[in-house]
């Protein structure tokens, strides 16, 4: 099976530093769930851009940090993940954490949804948090 690509796009002025490190980490996280890498796009945007998508496609009149459109086929993960960098920054401030740490959590949250993990019930949320922590621990940057 041909391996897909993980790509990063920006609809605002956000620039993801160390793109290849993030790509390698996401690939490692996907493989750790015994899944395959299809074409996955992360699209960074602002609150208004994501709010418009939330209204148009999900009929939700709320701001959110992430919306994922899952096109996974079998065990091959693919789809589009929209992330509001404004909301990530606000969450980082609220949770007293660094922007990069909160961004990792949101990035991997979308991937975990593609892997089949849900977060509607309290039990599902607890498992999602554990999985997020497990995958964040896989992120290593060589200095």
Swiss-Prot record:
Cofactor(s) required, per the database record: Zn(2+)
EC number: 3.1.-.-
Pfam family, one: YbeY
Transmembrane intervals: none
GO biological process terms held by the UniProt record: rRNA processing
Annotated keywords: Cytoplasm, Endonuclease, Hydrolase, Metal-binding, Nuclease, Ribosome biogenesis, rRNA processing, Zinc
GO cellular component assignments: cytoplasm
InterPro entries, A to Z: MetalPrtase_cat_dom_sf_prd, YbeY
Entry GO MF terms: metalloendopeptidase activity; RNA endonuclease activity; zinc ion binding
Cofactor note text: Binds 1 zinc ion.
Keyword Protein transport: no
Enzyme's top EC category: hydrolase
Annotated compartments: Cytoplasm
Residue sites binding Zn(2+) per the record: 109, 113, 119
Family named by the database record: Belongs to the endoribonuclease YbeY family.
Purpose: Single strand-specific metallo-endoribonuclease involved in late-stage 70S ribosome quality control and in maturation of the 3' terminus of the 16S rRNA.
Protein name as catalogued: Endoribonuclease YbeY
Organism expressing this protein natively: Christiangramia forsetii (strain DSM 17595 / CGMCC 1.15422 / KT0803)
